[in-house]
């Protein structure tokens, strides 16, 4: 509706920069000038339009852009992705190519990507816009699992019933 919800969250994610004011994380002012900065503060954003490479596997997309020094240990990456999926109830195969995935599986890859990077604050922009009612309920179950694990969840949506179903 043009009120600036996504713009504000993009500032927290390091995509846009505020003209004035300050960002506080755990009560302390911080400077977020890039997505890397936001991850250092435990903030990860899952955008409405996914940023995935279709010919890569889920795990390859999840670790893409990380500087882990040297060659990628794909077996270790697959194991860590599987561990995150098992912990929260996600159902994705780390070795599956993105082009073979459903929309909800692609969204799951994006969520696991921010968890892999250590996000404790997850921002989801219109997360149910392209999901079926069944996929939406499954997503809500996973989000509740994350919340129970101490993660903060911020959802940008126009669907008031979803806000009421998830908020505390």
Where do the model's predicted regions map?
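Glycine-rich phosphate-binding loops of nucleotide-dependent enzymes
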Residues: 1-168
């Amino acid at each position: 509706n043009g009120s600036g919800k996504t713009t504000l969250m993009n500032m927290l994610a390091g995509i846009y920069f505020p003209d004035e004011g300050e960002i506080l994380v755990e009560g302390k002012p911080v400077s977020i000038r890039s997505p890397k900065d936001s991850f250092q503060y435990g903030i990860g954003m899952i955008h409405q339009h996914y940023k995935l490479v279709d010919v890569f596997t889920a795990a390859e997309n999840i670790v893409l852009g990380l500087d882990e020094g040297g060659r990628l240990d794909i077996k270790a990456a697959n194991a860590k992705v599987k561990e995150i999926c098992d912990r929260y109830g996600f159902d994705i195969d780390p070795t599956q190519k993105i082009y073979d995935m459903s929309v909800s599986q692609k969204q799951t890859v994006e969520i696991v990507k921010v968890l892999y990077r250590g996000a404790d604050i997850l921002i989801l922009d219109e997360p149910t816009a392209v999901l079926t009612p069944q996929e939406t309920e499954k997503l809500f179950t996973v989000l509740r699992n994350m919340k129970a694990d101490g993660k903060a969840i911020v959802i940008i949506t126009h669907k008031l019933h979803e806000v009421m179903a998830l908020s505390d």
